[in-house]
């Protein structure tokens, strides 16, 4: 049976928690798909780049610029940090 595990982006930012989780996943959940967030990372990156983030009822409104930032945060920063921790 394959398990799908979703973790939030804030967890990825905490190295101690991330490393503990990755150790646990490696030991216990071999047949798993790990899905990660990264909204907080996208927000931080947007702020650094001076790109205004619009939120409505806790949901990010994604225009062209914020979509580019989201791709950088999710596919770059968050993903690479998670993969490095799993290796």
Task: Give the ranges of each region predicted by the language model.
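Nucleotide/pyrophosphate-binding catalytic subdomain
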Residues: 1-87
């Amino acid at each position: 049976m394959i398990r799908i595990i979703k973790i939030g982006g804030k967890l990825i930012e905490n190295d101690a928690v991330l490393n503990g989780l990755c150790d646990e996943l490696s030991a216990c959940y071999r047949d798993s798909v790990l899905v990660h967030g990264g909204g907080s990372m996208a927000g931080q990156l947007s702020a650094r780049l001076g790109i205004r983030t619009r939120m409505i009822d806790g949901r990010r409104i994604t225009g062209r610029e914020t979509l580019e930032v989201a791709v950088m945060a999710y596919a770059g920063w968050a993903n690479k940090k998670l993969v490095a921790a799993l290796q």
